Amino acid sequence: MVSRVAKNPIKIPTGVEVNVAGQQITVKGKLGTLTRVIHRAVKVTKTDAELQTICANDSPGSNALAGTARAVLANMVQGVHTGFQRKLVMVGVGYRAKAEDKKLNLTVGLSHPVNIEMPEGITVETPSQTEIIVKGADKQRVSQVAANIREIRPPEPYKGKGIRYDNERVILKEAKKK
């Protein structure tokens, strides 16, 4: 029995180079190089323009691992080809963001400005003072950096002030009545 996710092969677009060396998979593209070691219960085979993940043995849970490995590899291929981005929006009076080189400066109502150093392979843009766009080739890293930025001032439930994802809905509570 094969995982439904792992059944689908991953198409390798032109300009993307995939190297399979045992359990270590390296994907190169115009946006960089990503390397990941996959679990030994999963076998990756490469044909002309496709990658296929299959279970290497019949151990319990290997179907799930094959599906997970397929999703991770698909994200790696997409990441080096088109990249990933997360958009954050700041809501609040005086809340501002400014990107400088590999740093993000935030003014979010604290007694001091917050400076965040971006990790390798991650870029940050501020199209306006209240918008932050985090870009990169590694989906996990982009999402983690965006979550770290949001964690500085998460949206509060009464007025909705804080840093939120662009598509996030904040459910507002009603104030206490007398």
From Swiss-Prot:
Task: Output the GO biological process annotations, alphabetical, semicolon-separated.
Answer: cytoplasmic translation
Q: Name one Pfam family in it.
A: Ribosomal_L6
Q: Which residues form the signal peptide?
A: none
Q: Which UniProt keywords apply?
A: Ribonucleoprotein, Ribosomal protein, RNA-binding, rRNA-binding
Q: Which GO terms describe its molecular function?
A: rRNA binding; structural constituent of ribosome
Q: Which InterPro entries match?
A: Ribosomal_uL6-like, Ribosomal_uL6-like_a/b-dom_sf, Ribosomal_uL6_a/b-dom, Ribosomal_uL6_bac-type, Ribosomal_uL6_CS
| Gene3D superfamilies, alphabetized | Ribosomal protein L6, alpha-beta domain (3.90.930.12)
Record's GO cellular component terms? cytosolic large ribosomal subunit
Q: Which NCBIfam families match?
A: L6_bact
List the PANTHER family hit by this protein, alphabetically.
60S/50S RIBOSOMAL PROTEIN L6/L9, LARGE RIBOSOMAL SUBUNIT PROTEIN UL6M
Family listed: Belongs to the universal ribosomal protein uL6 family.
* Assembly and oligomerization: Part of the 50S ribosomal subunit.
Name the job this protein performs.
This protein binds to the 23S rRNA, and is important in its secondary structure. It is located near the subunit interface in the base of the L7/L12 stalk, and near the tRNA binding site of the peptidyltransferase center.
Q: What is this protein called?
A: Large ribosomal subunit protein uL6
